[in-house]
């Protein structure tokens, strides 16, 4: 299975990055995993700080940084069986077969536009860190 991972905060080298790249590392044991990020140094810092083995994760061009055209982003995401996306409050429009959205802020505090409601239909699962984040 071909899986893409995106964390817009990869350069923060914090707990969320540990969480996302631990997921990537686990998935890479049995699947082909690509991390959408342009700076290898950031990934190396995460690997060292959190003692993660990221050797099986492929670093690929960050198509979510705004410099890639909508068409190119869509065509690239279509090549993936699954995408795991750490949301910065946005919901991506992608054409992967499956989309998993990780949210780190309380869902009740996120305003969802009509456009986002349409994009949510493509999300297979939303996962959160805690009951607090879920807004319970």
Q: PLM features: residue spans?
A:
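Active-site regions of enzymes building and remodeling cell-envelope glycoconjugates
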Residues: 49-62, 95-105, 123-124
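Active-site donor-binding segments of glycosyltransferases and PAPS-dependent sulfotransferases
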Residues: 33-90
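Extreme N-terminal starter segment of soluble prokaryotic enzymes
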Residues: 1-4
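A short, glycine/small-residue-rich beta-strand->loop->alpha-helix junction that serves as a flexible
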Residues: 6-21
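Membrane-proximal helix-turn-helix segments that form the acceptor-binding/catalytic region
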Residues: 74, 107-127, 132-136
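A short, Lys/Arg-enriched amphipathic alpha-helix followed by its capping loop at the start of a domain
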Residues: 23-31
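Active-site proximal beta-strand in glycosyltransferases
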Residues: 82-89, 93-112, 127
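Short, solvent-exposed loop/turn segments at secondary-structure junctions
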Residues: 9-11, 39-43, 88-91, 105-108, ...
């Amino acid at each position: 299975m071909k899986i893409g991972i995106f964390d817009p905060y990869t350069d923060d080298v914090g707990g969320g990055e540990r969480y996302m790249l631990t997921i990537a590392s686990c998935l890479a044991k049995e699947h082909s995993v690509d991390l959408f990020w342009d700076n290898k140094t950031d990934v190396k810092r995460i690997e060292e700080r959190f003692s993660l083995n990221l050797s099986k994760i492929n670093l690929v061009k960050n198509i979510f940084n705004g410099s890639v055209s909508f068409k190119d982003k869509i065509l690239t995401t279509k090549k993936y069986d699954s995408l795991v996306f750490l949301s910065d409050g946005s919901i991506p429009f992608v054409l992967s077969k499956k989309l998993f959205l990780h949210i780190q802020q309380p869902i009740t505090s996120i305003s969802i536009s009509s456009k986002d409601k349409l994009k949510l239909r493509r999300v297979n699962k939303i996962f959160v860190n805690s009951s607090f984040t879920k807004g319970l």
